[in-house]
C-alpha cells in the first residue's frame, strides 16, 4: 500500500530491465540582446515500466487468470484460503506494474530579448514544451503532462530583482486506460527581492515578497497520482527573509 498516492500497488517479479535509445538535438542562439534555445528529442524505450490503475472488474479478471494458473500448477490444492479478503484494499485504488514498448517524442524552446533599463537588465521571454508518449501497440502512456506556454518578464539590478511569470497549461485528453482528463489553467506568479546589507556590510538580508497562483485558479497536475483529490495550491502570498553572515 502506498498511502501518499492512494494506491494499492501490485508488483511483478517477471518484469525485465528497460532499454532506451535516445536522440536529443539542442540549438542555442544569442546576439545583440536576442536569445533563443530549442531542443527536440525522441526516446525509444523497450519494456517501459509503468503503473496502471485498474477497475475491480479488471482486477477480478486478473485474479481469475492467476487462479487458473495456480490450479494448473497445484492440482488438488484447497482454493478457499488463497484469495479470501484480497479484494479489500482499504479504499485504495488498485494499480499494477506493467511493461510495454513505448515512444516519447517532444520538444521545448524559449526565445526572448534582454534590454538595459534604468541601470539594470530587463528580459522578456516566451517558451513552450510538449511531450507525446505512446505505446508501440497503441494507446497513450499514463500521467504525461500536456503542452505548456510560458511567458515571463524579469528585471535585475544590483541588490534588486523582480519577476512575473504566466504559465498557460493546456488540457490533457490523451489518456491511458482508466485515466481521467485534466482541464487547462493559467498560473500567474510574481516575485520581488531586495538585498539589504547588515552587520556593517559583513552580512546580507534578502527580503522576498512573493505571490503564487495570483488568479486563484483550480489547477491540477496531470502527472500527479492524486490530481483528482488534491489540486495545486490556490492563491498564496508571503514574505520571506534569508540572512547570510
Model region roles, listed by residue range:
Residues 1-22, 40-66, 71-89, 167-177, ...:
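Surface-exposed extracellular loop regions of Gram-negative outer-membrane beta-barrel proteins
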Residues 10, 20-24, 95-97, 102-110, ...:
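Transmembrane beta-barrel architecture of outer-membrane proteins
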Residues 20, 30-34, 114-119, 156-160, ...:
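Outer-membrane beta-barrel channels and translocator barrels
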Residues 25-29, 107-113, 151-155, 164, ...:
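Residues on the lipid-exposed face of transmembrane beta-strands in outer-membrane beta-barrel proteins
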Residues 16-30, 35, 100-105, 142, ...:
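Outer-membrane beta-barrel transmembrane strands
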Residues 33, 232-245:
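Outer-membrane beta-barrel "beta-signal"
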Residues 41-45, 56, 62-63, 68, ...:
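Gram-negative outer-membrane beta-barrel transporters
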Amino acid at each position: 500500500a502506498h498511502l501518499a498516492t492512494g494506491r494499492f500497488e501490485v508488483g511483478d517479479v517477471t518484469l525485465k530491465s528497460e532499454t532506451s535509445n535516445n536522440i536529443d538535438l539542442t540549438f542555442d542562439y544569442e546576439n545583440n540582446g536576442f536569445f533563443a534555445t530549442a531542443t527536440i528529442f525522441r526516446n525509444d524505450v523497450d519494456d517501459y515500466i509503468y503503473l496502471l490503475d485498474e477497475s475491480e472488474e479488471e482486477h477480478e479478471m486478473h485474479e481469475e487468470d492467476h487462479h487458473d494458473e495456480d490450479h494448473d500448477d497445484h492440482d488438488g490444492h484447497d482454493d478457499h484460503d488463497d484469495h479470501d479478503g484480497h479484494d479489500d484494499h482499504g479504499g485504495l485504488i488498485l494499480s499494477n506494474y506493467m511493461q510495454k514498448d513505448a515512444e516519447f517524442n517532444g520538444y521545448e524552446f524559449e526565445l526572448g530579448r534582454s534590454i538595459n533599463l534604468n541601470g539594470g537588465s530587463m528580459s522578456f521571454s516566451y517558451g513552450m514544451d510538449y511531450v507525446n508518449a505512446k505505446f508501440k501497440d497503441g494507446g497513450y502512456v499514463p500521467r504525461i503532462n500536456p503542452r505548456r506556454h510560458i511567458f515571463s518578464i524579469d528585471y535585475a539590478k544590483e541588490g534588486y530583482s523582480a519577476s512575473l511569470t504566466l504559465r498557460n497549461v493546456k488540457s490533457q485528453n490523451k489518456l491511458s486506460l482508466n485515466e481521467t482528463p485534466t482541464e487547462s489553467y493559467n498560473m500567474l506568479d510574481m516575485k520581488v527581492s531586495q538585498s539589504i546589507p547588515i552587520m556593517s556590510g559583513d552580512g546580507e538580508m534578502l527580503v522576498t515578497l512573493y505571490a503564487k497562483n495570483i488568479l486563484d485558479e483550480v489547477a491540477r497536475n496531470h502527472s500527479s497520482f492524486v490530481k483528482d483529490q488534491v489540486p495545486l495550491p490556490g492563491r498564496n502570498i508571503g514574505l520571506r527573509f534569508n540572512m547570510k553572515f
